[in-house]
Amino acid sequence: MKKKPIYLWVLLILSALISVSSLFGMLGPIPSKEVLRSAAAQKQVAGVSAQQVEDSINYSYRVAEISHSIFNVALIVLSAILVVVAIVFLIRKNLQYANYTYVGYVLLAIIGSIYGYVGLQDAVQLVQDETMRLTMSIGSKAVSIFYSVINILFLALVFYKMWRQQKALAEEETEEVA
C-alpha cells in the first residue's frame, strides 16, 4: 500500500492548471458591446449578415456577463482553494483527505458545468438567426457533456483508487491479526 498516488498528482496538476486559467479569465474585465462591435468590424467575413454579427456580439457579451457573475466567481475561487488544499494534503502524505478534497473539487466542477450550460442556453436565446442559434446550442451542449463526462471519469477514478486503498488496508489488518 506504499505506492505513490501518481493518479492524484496528475489529476491535481491538471485541475490546478484549469483553476489558474479560470482565475486569470475572471480577473479580466467584461468587454463592452462597443469593443465587441469594433472587433467584429475588423473580422468582417463575407456572407455574414448584420443580424448575425449583432447576434454574435449579444451572445459574446452575455457569456462574458455569466462568466463574471458572483456565483461563477465563487465557484472558481472555491475550486482553486480546494485544489490547493488537496495538494497540501498530498504533500503531507495524507492521501485520504487529499482524495476527499479532490472529490469535493470534482463535484464543484460538475456544478460549474451545469451552471455554465444553463448560462449558455440563456445566452443562446439572444440569437435571432435560427441556424446560428442551433449551432451555438449544439456546441454548448457538446462542451457541457464533454466536461461532465471528464469530471465523472475523474470522480470514478478517485473512488476506485479509494476503494482499492481501503481494500489493501483491510488486507494488511487481517494479516497483522493472523
Identify the function of each model-found stretch.
Residues 47-54, 71-100:
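Hydrophobic alpha-helical transmembrane segments
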Residues 1-39, 157-167, 176-178:
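Cytosolic juxtamembrane helix and N-cap/initiation of the first transmembrane helix
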Residues 134-178:
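Terminal transmembrane helical module of multi-pass membrane proteins
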Residues 1-12, 62-72, 92-102, 134-144:
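Membrane-water interface of alpha-helical transmembrane segments
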